[in-house]
Amino acid sequence: MRGTDTFTESLFTMRKLEDFVPARHPLREIRKTANAALDKLGPTLTAMYAAEVKGGRPSIAPEKLLRAMLLQVLFSVRSERQLMEQVHYNLLFRWFIGLSMDDAVWVPTVFTKNRERLIKHDAVIKFFNEVVDIAHKRDLLSGEHFSVDGTLIQAWAGHKSFVPKDDKPDADGGGAPAGDFKGQRRSNDTHESKSDGDARLYRKGNTASELRYMGHTLSDNRHGLIASAMVTQADGFAEREAAKAMISDARQALGDDEREMTLGADKGYDAKEFIDACMSMKVTPHVAQNTSGRKSAVPDEIAQTQGYATSQRKRKLIEQGFGWAKTVGGIRQVMVRGLERVDQMFVLTMAAYNLVRMRSLGQVRLQAAQ
């Protein structure tokens, strides 16, 4: 007998939100790990708000806010407005964030108002560090052998906004038309973006000059997990300076100044001052030798070792993080402005990448055990 096309909505349901999420859904393990990291941030998140004795209306739980920001990265949602629209009807999103089926959806400006608070208290950086610490406890990191690299991030600003620093529009609105820079010599010394003052006009290799930032990551060679991440203004020295800062932090985290550490990198890091800096930190520089019309700063006795060959093979894992961040995480062109905001978004994206990668590695171990 043919059924009738009718719809009768029940006024009550006896099912929990948890029941709608498949038992083997990837987000289950990701949420579990993210919550373990957030649990360690209690004092930091509490310090972000006024003491309870002062009264006032309770804020949106910062843990829920951070989980929502993770969702935006994991599912390539373009904007907070679109994210809130999807949370309204997506039960999976509600479950991950921690909203019940009846909870009201936030207005998108919640993210704008809380972003500065998260930056001020380094909440995203501390969350990233807790995720890395969990990976270390699961024996997913070597803690000794690393690779470093940088990538260009297109700023949320165009060429038309890149004008002379002393450029002031006429009272009558006259002057050169916006974006009419043909025949002009433009540089970061004389020009700046009115849309994003921290962005820099930069090109690398055969790429076109664009307003950009530069993202840097330090990856652990065991499984390619990101051990450190940061964003700087784009210039020719940023990669090496960021690498020195990140490997110095890794040395301090190791807690043993005499323990051997290695650092793999491409030819762009083959500079005497960088190699000397690594040596001074007792880090063996497994940097690709650049012998194009010059002598490499990397000693031949290092370049001929088996460890050097292994580092050169393993350093390619770092590209997986950049690839994921640009195709899934939306870092190819950021939708925020200012160095601090771009850095926050980049670090959060790398934390999300680690969560996804750790979940995959956990599945591999589980299958191997079976």
Residue ranges and their predicted role:
Residues F75-R81, F93-R94, D102-D103, A250-R259, ...:
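Secondary-structure transition/capping motifs at alpha-helix termini
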Residues D167, A171, P177-A178, K267-E340, ...:
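Helix-centered, glycine/charged polyanion-binding patches within enzymatic domains
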Residues R2-D5, I30-L140, A155:
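Basic, low-complexity intrinsically disordered segments
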Residues P22, P26, G56-K64, S79, ...:
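Secondary-structure capping and boundary motifs in well-ordered enzyme cores
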Residues G330-Q370:
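C-terminal extensions of enzymes
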Residues H88, I97-A277, Y353, R359:
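Polybasic low-complexity intrinsically disordered regions
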Residues E52-R57, T291-V298, R365:
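Arg/Lys-rich, glycine/proline-spaced intrinsically disordered segments
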Residues M1-A37, F181, M358-Q370:
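Charged, often Cys/His-bearing segments associated with DNA-binding zinc-finger transcription factors
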